[in-house]
Amino acid sequence: MTCRLPRPGFQLTYPPAVAENQPIIKHRMNAELLAFAAHLRELMLARRFTRGAGESDRQFDPLARELFALQFHHNPAYGKICAVRGATPATVRHWSDIPAVPTAAFKELEFTSIPPAERTAVFHSSGTTGQQPSRHFHCAASLALYETSLCQGYEPHFGFAGRLVILTPPPAQAPHSSLVHMFDTLRRQFAPDTAQFFGQMGADAGWELDLPRLLPALTNASQSAEPVTLLGTAFSFVHLLDYLASENRRFKLPPGSRVLETGGYKNRSRTLPKAELHALIADCLGLAPAAIGCEYGMSELSSQAYDCALSADMGGFASEFFSEISAKAGSGGLRPLAGGEILDKARRSQTAATRSKPVATAKDDFCRDVYFEFPPWARVRIISPETGREAAEGETGLIRLHDLANVFSVAAIQTEDLGIRRGGGFELLGRATAAEPRGCSLNVGEVKSQQT
């Protein structure tokens, strides 16, 4: 697949079918949603998104409100919630006024505009065994957008580092894991011939490492000059570290190797402070601490955030990556890859010495003091639980996300995570005990009764 750039002045407009009295199409995919998703994907591939505050909002706001109008009319559960809150396409004047759905509501209601016959995948949250998980339904078009968002967001932050060693089960064993799908997408896009999964499902249906295969792979990687990237959850790395400690073993991975750690512990291992975990990983794998990064995501989203230290370590690549002008595609400065990714190799030669770099000094099992950043088609707001309003810079609140890539679900998501605004990014503090901000209560029973 090649990168198809929008023609100069290209604009996708929608007919007035999103009027207040528009009927909901239940038995086939809505053409307007498909068109919006295709347009958004073109913008991602062409690097048409910008980060500058004023210009970025002028671009993001109309897209967010257009998507809200579509989701209001074609996502029945979401439309009911918005109507109860008095929010309609006619009353919402700015994207920040769009109602957010708590992640807990995804356990009770189907927030989707995809007809059942066209659903090809569903991602579940990784909650406590026996509990109803959150559900995020996908179709071919939504997965294509998800994977474009993933690859376009991952590369500028993390770059390429040869082979991929993935510490999760393969998709066949974990078909409802968005994290496994994420890693498999990276495998197919960046290392289809060399990447391998080294996790498996245990007897208790939990994830565990396939150590008889993993250890020889790490030995071979240590003896090679080709960099390797390890992808895995925090608890998978703890399992690996504990085994290496018991055997008094260490590896020395090649220069340029990296680690992406995500997903938390899920009660699958002992819990380590983030700084201690990363120090142990660096020591046991022979890496510099700067080579270890974090990712923040969830099954309800279609975009991911990465810690800002990753982009700073790459010379500030991510901060400028998304403002490329598509005309460069024909000038030789950019080259399209299979899947439509566009790379500017010159950016990777920039030195990190000229950029400020946040230092990870985590104090608990979350990524405290690691600052995360989403791609420019997603926005983060920190909401005060007491007032329901946006918290000031440096104040603690609940993380609210607005992900345009969630075209066929709900773009505005209220998480249960606490965070602090840090410039254009945020600091993750952990899970809130009382996670619902004022003004965001959701009567699930009422919505269910209105759907019947």
Regions found by a protein language model. Give the residues of each.
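Short polybasic/polar patches that bind polyanions
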Residues: 83, 141, 283
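Active-site glycine/GP-rich loop and adjacent strand/helix microenvironment
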Residues: 25-44, 58-70, 162-163, 167-170, ...
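A conserved hydrophobic position in a structured secondary element of the catalytic/binding core
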Residues: 20, 73, 232
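Conserved adenylate-forming
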Residues: 126-174
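Intrinsic disorder/low-complexity segments
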Residues: 1-28, 314-368
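Active-site diphosphate/adenylate-binding microenvironment
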Residues: 54, 58, 70-73, 77-124, ...
